[in-house]
């Protein structure tokens, strides 16, 4: 289940094309006591994938996240679903992100290629450490995969992987040619 906890600037509802989003109960309804958990979980178009969206912007999201209902929601979701993935606001931008991370087993830090500074990344690592959240990894987002810089670094791997038969070079062809029982080179 994906839980959209970016209560100030959510983009999940638009990406999932939820119709009449502003009229449906969402995470804010649950946190404010207006809905039960079952009322704010929606099926997605992906089999066995669900979402708890934030479809309406909230005035005081920090207070709602500090309430015990949020921690209870995460506990109940963890009992029901194999994975609970939380989309939070960026670390360093609002206190919510570190607060949310403190309730998680781990975090994957998403950084935008060419825009996120090293100092902000380092600060994010420190924030996760301070709240006791394990850094699971870093996801590089919007990386340029064409052009000279990309080819300079990654282009050499075609030659390297050819010896392992990953679709490059002639490894597969040599193995097929020697199928008569004679050893290949």
Walk through the language-model features, giving the residues of each:
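P-loop NTP-binding module
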Residues: 1-185
